[in-house]
């Protein structure tokens, strides 16, 4: 499926490259935080592009600093637990790729539902 991320870079290099992810909720249909969770990445709290509406800096849904900080806290907590672990599995759980799951070597998993814009984190050993 086009929606299903099959990011071999994240699978192969997850435990040796820190790749920060934007925390923007671009629209009611796309939330970058979900991608950060799937990859076990680190968050950007505030990321301004060099030019407005370019370089990944788009005016999407406005999120308060308080909410952005809470979103970053969730991603940071996961990253702290998984940064040095292998990202051992990524799968699409639905045919259209709207629900995806990542699993780390200690059993920690993340399920993201892109249609409903929700996630579940289960921490391993």
Placement of each model-derived feature along the sequence:
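Active-site-proximal substrate-binding groove within the catalytic cores of carbohydrate-active enzymes
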Residues: 1-125
């Amino acid at each position: 499926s086009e929606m299903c991320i099959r990011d071999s870079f994240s699978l192969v290099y997850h435990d040796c490259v820190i790749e920060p992810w934007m925390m923007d909720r671009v629209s009611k249909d796309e939330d970058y935080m979900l991608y950060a969770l799937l990859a076990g990445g680190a968050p950007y709290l505030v990321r301004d592009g060099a030019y407005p509406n370019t370089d990944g800096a788009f005016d999407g849904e406005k999120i308060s600093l308080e909410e952005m900080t809470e979103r970053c806290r969730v991603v940071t907590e996961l990253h702290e637990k998984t940064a040095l672990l292998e990202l051992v599995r990524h799968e699409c759980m639905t045919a259209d790729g709207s629900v995806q799951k990542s699993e780390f070597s200690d059993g920690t998993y993340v399920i993201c539902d892109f249609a409903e814009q929700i996630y579940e984190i289960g921490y391993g050993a």
